[in-house]
Curated annotation (Swiss-Prot):
A zinc finger (C2H2-type) spans 27-49, 55-77, 83-105, 136-158, 164-186, 192-214, 220-242, 248-270, 276-298, 304-326, 332-354, 360-382, 388-412. This is Zinc finger protein 260. Its main location: nucleus. Belongs to the krueppel C2H2-type zinc-finger protein family.
Length: 412
């Protein structure tokens, strides 16, 4: 107590300090009417409305409006969890999360929304979702927000202001924190680590999405069929299977796709890009996942076994398709003629018999094909490649079926 009195050298300091004990809060925010016992707390609070963020994280560049917010944020890097539950041992980095967790043991829910079960301190902000209160409106387009900071960020869409530029690739950003996050791509810095498996990420958002793999959380649900996803972008892409929307079009052949990644992979057909090479046999692939699957041919590994007939497969997708032989399930039906297939890829190829589409063109002679595998066989006419050799007489063939037919000469 003596130490406290010694530190309060001025009468004004003592009077202000006494307000902590009396509960008096004479300092009111003119934006939201929240009151404070100390003037410096009001000054810090006002930064939430002005959007001022003066405290920067040295790890990832995120800026916070208050020192206390920065201190809490730093725990996401250090992994420090100072608040431990004496009931179950679970630890937390933030006090409010710890206090909220304890209510699971006591059953206490003192601040509950009448619409859904959400507790303080988020209830006031959350209730605006029900009341529709959005006092901060954009003068350009009229869009309204429930916080001034959200409006400030939104307004940059109209001004196009991006003052923070990457000196590696020239990409510009509206906020410094976005630039610092982006620069992790160039530096390879991954400050956000998963506590479950140790995988590290350059951005916190990516870590949050990744952690859902461990928790099983899938917050984005399709209203059409009920299927749920761990990230919003996956839901948006999935919904196109219901709407039929294909916004990404190939400039070479006009083929449209529902996802940008599908278009990127398709475009490699035209440029002939195959960056992934098998170090065993030299076969090259357009996608890394195809190379990984191909490796099982050399290792002989087949971890997925059919519980009906015992047949084993190197890929789980192959097992799923195989099981349909036993069940007779053919979930992919042609809307034109009604023919059904057990694989979506088979339906895609079949549809080309109706549309006449031949997206795979030969770079040598221009002949086009409906399937990539047919193009690959055709290319051997130009290259002279004959990978199938008869062990009896040494004669070689470009196609496996020709090789098998030839071998019958020796067996008869």
């Amino acid at each position: 107590m003596i130490g406290m009195l010694e530190s309060l050298q001025h009468e004004s300091d003592l009077l202000q300090h006494d307000q902590i004990h009396t509960g008096e809060k004479p300092y009111e925010c003119n934006e939201c009417r929240k009151t404070f016992s100390l003037k410096q707390n009001l000054v810090e609070h006002k930064k939430m409305h002005t959007g001022e963020k003066s405290h920067e994280c040295t790890e990832c560049g995120k800026v916070c409006s208050r020192v206390s917010s920065l201190t809490l944020h730093l725990r996401s890097h250090t992994g420090k969890k100072a608040y431990k539950c004496n009931k179950c041992g679970k630890a937390f980095s933030q006090k409010e999360n710890f206090l909220s967790h304890q209510k699971h043991h006591t059953g206490e829910k003192p601040y509950e929304c009448e619409k859904v079960s959400i507790q303080m301190p988020t209830i006031i902000r959350h209730q605006k979702n029900h009341t529709g209160t959005k006092p901060y409106a954009c003068k350009e387009c009229g869009k309204a927000f429930n916080g001034k900071a959200y409006l400030t960020e939104h307004e940059k869409i109209h001004t196009g202001e991006k003052p923070f530029e990457c000196n590696q690739c020239g990409r510009a950003f509206s906020q410094k924190q976005y630039l610092i996050k982006h620069q992790n791509i160039h530096t390879g810095k991954k400050p956000f680590k998963c506590s479950e498996c140790g995988k590290a990420f350059s951005q916190k958002e990516n870590l949050i999405i990744h952690q859902r793999i461990h928790t099983g959380e899938k917050p984005y649900e399709c209203k059409g069929c009920g299927k749920a996803f761990i990230q919003k972008s996956s839901l948006i892409r999935h919904q196109r299977s219901h709407t039929g929307e294909k916004p990404y079009t190939c400039k070479e052949c006009g083929k449209a796709f529902s996802g940008k990644s599908n278009l990127t992979e398709h475009e490699k057909i035209h440029i002939g890009e195959k960056p992934y090479k098998c170090n065993e046999c030299g076969t090259i692939f357009r996608q890394k996942q195809y190379l990984i699957k191909h490796h099982n041919i050399h290792t002989g590994e087949k971890p997925y076994e059919c519980n009906k007939c015992g047949k084993a497969f190197s890929r789980i997708t192959s097992l799923i398709v195989h099981v349909r032989i036993h069940t007779g399930d053919k979930p992919y039906e042609c809307k034109v003629c009604g023919k059904a297939f057990c694989q979506s890829s088979s339906l895609t190829v079949h549809m080309r018999s109706h549309t006449g589409e031949k997206p795979y063109g030969c770079n040598e002679c221009g002949k086009a094909f409906s399937q990539f595998s047919t193009l690959a066989l055709h290319m051997r006419i130009h290259t002279g490649e004959k990978p199938y050799q008869c062990s009896e007489c040494g004669k070689a063939f470009s196609q496996k079926s020709h090789h098998i037919r030839h071998q019958r000469i020796h067996t008869h």
